[in-house]
Amino acid sequence: MTVRLRLAVTAAAAVVMTGCATETPDYQSVWSTTTAPPTTTTDASTPPKSIAAFLEESGVGGQPVAPDKLTDLTVSIPTPAGWQPYMNTNLAPGTRTIAKGDTYPMAMLMVFELDGDFDVTQALSHANADAQMSENFRELNTSAEPFNGFPSSMIEGSYDLNGSRMHSYNRIVIATGAPPKAQRYLIQFTVTGYADKAAEEAPDIETIIKGFTVKLP
């Protein structure tokens, strides 16, 4: 059964909001669910379109896949000492989530097997929209450079969430698996924590970000 990308992202976001954050941005929390008000857009009447919305409008479906179940693509993140798997039934099936303690800092990895044709460049032009619509979002860094040879978009920033200032990192990669199938995947990797603990948590966060892997087997 194909899961609509928007709904899967919403579920993950809701989990982050209710109890899961870091020094590098997690735009799962930014997508703090269904309809976060576009507080940082220049025209509130026309908020930016998310990548999930773009893909849905293009007729593209997405089926969640556990990263460790992939056979035509290697997708993984490391687990620093003191971090452990974070389980929540609201997360999309197959989501890999690790946290230090009961909530933040947290890292989340989701993979969607895509069904349908679309313009990758156009899709990635919408990759940062959800982050930019978070409350009082302040951009710190962005990149549209490929990641390990795959089309990608990255954004870092800080934003307000439930009375706390968060610092988050989000990267979306659109990768094509090994032949002969050459399946296309959307990979979303996010890391989030409290902004006031950014320096303290930086070593672990940097380890996770640097260890994020997307490659052909």
Question: What do the predicted segments below correspond to?
Answer:
Residues G61-T71, R96-K100, S143-P146, G157-Y159:
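Short acidic-hydrophobic surface loop/beta-edge motif
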Residues L70-T74, D102-M106, F150-S152:
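Extracytoplasmic
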Residues L114-G116, Y159-N162, G193-K197:
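Solvent-exposed loop/turn segments at secondary-structure junctions
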Residues Q122, H126, D204-T207:
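Extracytoplasmic/secreted proteins, especially bacterial periplasmic and envelope-associated proteins
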Residues P180-I187:
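Short hydrophobic/glycine-rich mini-motifs in sensory/regulatory modules
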